[in-house]
Amino acid sequence: MICTAGAAALNASFQVSPGGLAYSAEVEVAEASGYGFWDAGPLGERIPRQVSNVSLHGACGNCSFDWVDPFTMNFTKGNYTILYTGQVMENHLQGSFDSPYRVSVALPPGLDVRDPLLGMLSPGSEVTENVSSLSIVWNATRSFELRFYTPERERLLLAFGTLWLVGLVLVLVPFLLERRVRGKGP
């Protein structure tokens, strides 16, 4: 749920917490002197995004930075890794950068994105499943977006689909039988 400004990202990784309510991020920037935390709005506008536990790491170890405003940080130009945490809104995680980068998102067991009726992935993603998580990777992309779901939502979809099909059969079968009887007529 971020959009970066003023930084060229090389790699970005996001780890969604169990339960899907928060995430932690690690973003590499090269020859950058600032970084902004933003959501992309429906028209591409920048909407400030609240993050916490922000830290900057580089050749200086745990480097210092200044806040320009509550959503933009400045630091000495260089290559860094920015670590932070944020909240996931409505099982939806998105991000965009000023230049192409490689992004990976790790979902914990119990969260999934592979059912197109419940989940969503932006184009160019590769999904792999391993023992401890579900990994989604985009290579050389300027933006990513995903919507994940829980097993409960999958069961609700199955129940709704089953009820819908039963209702369809209860309406359609008598209609077809009546039509067949009328077709034979005296």
Role assignments for model-derived ranges:
Residues 3-186:
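Lumenal/extracellular ectodomains and adaptor appendage modules
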